C-alpha cells in the first residue's frame, strides 16, 4: 500500500537515506541531501529495522566477505556474491516480498523504465519501480553470473538461480539474508520481512 502517512513517508525516507548514505560513503556522489531532512516521527511501537549505517555495512560486508574466506567457502562466495548483492539491493530498494523476488523472470525486468513486473498475492500483477542503485546491481548480476549460467530444464526464465541452477526458493533467500545479517547486526534478528520494514 502506497501512502503519504507518517509510516509511508518514513519508509520512503529510510530507503532514500540508505542508498544515498551508501553511495556517499563510496564517493560515488559528493553530497547526501537526505541528511538535511528530518525523519517523520512514528507514534506506534518500534519495529526492528536496519538503520542507514547498517544497510551500508550489510552491503559492504557482502561485497568484501571473500577477503576472510578460503577453499570451498571462498568458491561458493564468488559464485553467489553478485546474485546476493542484487537480491539484497532489490529487497531494500523496492520493499517487495521474498516470494515476489524469487518469482521474477528475466523478462520481468525493464531497464528502460527501471521497473519490475511482480506477481502479488492473489495473482495480481503490478509494476514496481526501482532506482539507479538497484538497476546497477541487477545489470551486474544479469550480465555476469546469470548470463553465464546454464539453468536446468524448467528454470530457464528464472531471474535468480541457486547454485544447483534452479530457481531460488523463499527459504534459500531467507537463509542468505540471515547469514549476512548475523555478521553485521548480531543483536537484531533480521529477516527478509525486516528488510521490508527498512524500506
Describe the role of every protein-language-model region.
Residues 1-199:
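Conserved catalytic core of the tyrosine transesterase superfamily
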